[in-house]
Amino acid sequence: MARFYRRRKFCRFTAEGVEYIDYKDLDTLKAYITETGKIVPSRITGTKARYQRQLASAIKQARFLALLPYSDSHDN
């Protein structure tokens, strides 16, 4: 039987040399929220703790300014 190989997670922000995660960079932020609007945890994405904190505050700031939705699944 083939052995399951899990790809090593790496921090995208460290690899790209990002200093600060901007709340206006919606394409990056959308990659780190689920379709229901929840923030994806770092154990899934592999993001380092420093960038995960910046990411969470940037997502929350973008939500507050109505750039991102708080929840995305409205069935009405």
UniProtKB/Swiss-Prot annotation:
One cellular component (GO) term of this entry: cytosolic small ribosomal subunit
A Gene Ontology BP annotation from the UniProt entry: translation
Protein's UniProt keywords contain Ribosomal protein: yes
Keywords, ordered alphabetically: Ribonucleoprotein, Ribosomal protein, RNA-binding, rRNA-binding
Molecular function GO terms recorded: small ribosomal subunit rRNA binding; structural constituent of ribosome
Tree of life domain: Bacteria
Keyword Transcription regulation attached: no
Pfam family, one: Ribosomal_S18
Family: Belongs to the bacterial ribosomal protein bS18 family.
Subunit structure: Part of the 30S ribosomal subunit. Forms a tight heterodimer with protein bS6.
Functional description taken from the UniProt entry: Binds as a heterodimer with protein bS6 to the central domain of the 16S rRNA, where it helps stabilize the platform of the 30S subunit.
Family annotation (NCBIfam families): S18 (TIGR00165)
UniProt name for this protein: Small ribosomal subunit protein bS18
Name of the gene this protein is made from: rpsR
